[in-house]
A protein has these predicted regions:
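Hot-dog-fold acyl-thioester-processing enzymes
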Residues: 1-103, 163-168, 173-188
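Generic alpha-helix signal with a bias toward terminal, lower-confidence helices
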Residues: 61, 86, 112, 118-120, ...
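Hydrophobic beta-sheet segments that form the core/acyl-binding groove
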Residues: 99, 103-145
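An exposed, glycine/acidic-rich loop-and-rim segment of catalytic or binding clefts
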Residues: 128, 133-188
């Protein structure tokens, strides 16, 4: 389990990723790690929402509640630090470069006031092999005043050599729609 006090800067994230790049493959599990995947969990307690960043998010994405509450999709933005720590940890088997965000599911369980302090956690849930490489699911959770207020699952793809070469890519350039997916669910 990894605990962080604050999110690392973008520069620090990139420098750490560059240092680890030679030892980590894309889209393949190293033979010695295939059966010894360690659990990864990162927590970041006491996160305050930056009002300037929240206002920028609202300007770009809009806010259905008139700006009084945190928009349902915003908490994911707070997970840059915990997610970076997870994919840069020694236990994560793939290169952080080339990871592609392929799917997101979020659930707002109760309204989040912009002034509340959040406790964030993310953990590796599953790694599965697909024809395009390995998909990695991370579960994210934001607690406000000791109660779960928001959760989500992010799916990242580490493409294998075949997928990186463009084999199997759609000729018309259209991205396929994922049928039956409900990427957002609000209970409030």
């Amino acid at each position: 389990r990894i605990a962080i006090g604050r999110s690392p800067s973008t520069v620090a994230i990139y420098l750490r990723a560059i240092r680890r790049m030679p030892e980590r493959p894309q889209g393949a599990l190293p033979r010695d790690r295939a059966r010894t995947l360690a659990p990864i969990e990162v927590s970041q307690p006491g996160v305050r929402i930056n009002p300037v960043r929240l206002a920028l998010f609202r300007d770009v994405c809009g806010s259905p509640d008139g700006g009084l509450l945190v928009p349902p999709a915003y908490p994911e933005c707070l997970f840059l630090g915990p997610m970076a720590e997870a994919v840069l940890s020694d236990a994560f088997p793939f290169s952080p470069f080339g990871l592609i965000h392929v799917r997101q599911r979020i659930a707002l369980l109760c309204p989040i006031d912009p002034g509340v302090t959040l406790d964030l956690s993310c953990r590796l849930v599953e790694i599965r092999e697909t024809d395009r490489g390995f998909e990695v699911d991370f579960a994210m959770r934001a607690d406000a005043v000791g109660t779960e207020a928001w959760n989500g699952t992010t799916t990242l793809l580490s493409r294998n050599e075949r997928a990186r070469s463009g084999h199997g890519r759609s000729r018309d350039g259209q991205a396929p729609w994922i049928s039956g997916e409900d990427p957002f669910r609000s209970i409030v």
